């Protein structure tokens, strides 16, 4: 299974806020693996993660999150920013 396929699988799996910590960890692992395969895989993972997180960010009101959910959201945001902005 390619890293892009793994990314898509992860995106479909983690819909609940309570699962975001696990999702962030898994997504970071997918990204690190994609870096080993080259720029094409990385760019595909970046595009998918950016689309996903843009949607999540638009749907989530941070004021409505409890402490655990806010922590999970912040971790996911950190991982997504790393994927989006890290220079290779």
Predicted regions and their residues:
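Short terminal alpha-helical segments
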Residues: 1-29, 77, 82
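Amphipathic alpha-helical binding modules
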Residues: 54-88
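Non-transmembrane, amphipathic alpha-helical segments
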Residues: 12-15, 19, 37, 61-71
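Short, charged, amphipathic alpha-helical segments
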Residues: 24-29, 43-47, 66-74
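Acidic, low-complexity, intrinsically disordered interaction modules
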Residues: 34-65
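Acidic/proline-rich low-complexity IDRs
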Residues: 7-10, 36, 47, 64, ...
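Coiled-coil-like amphipathic alpha-helices with heptad-repeat character
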Residues: 1, 7-10, 15, 41, ...
């Amino acid at each position: 299974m390619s890293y892009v396929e793994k990314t898509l699988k992860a995106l479909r799996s983690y819909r609940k806020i309570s699962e975001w910590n696990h999702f962030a960890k898994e997504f970071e692992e997918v990204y690190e693996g994609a870096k080993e395969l080259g720029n094409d895989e990385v760019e595909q993972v970046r595009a998918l993660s950016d689309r996903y997180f843009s949607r999540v960010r638009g749907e989530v009101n941070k004021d409505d999150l409890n402490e655990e959910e806010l922590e999970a959201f912040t971790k996911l945001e950190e991982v997504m920013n790393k994927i989006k902005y890290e220079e290779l």
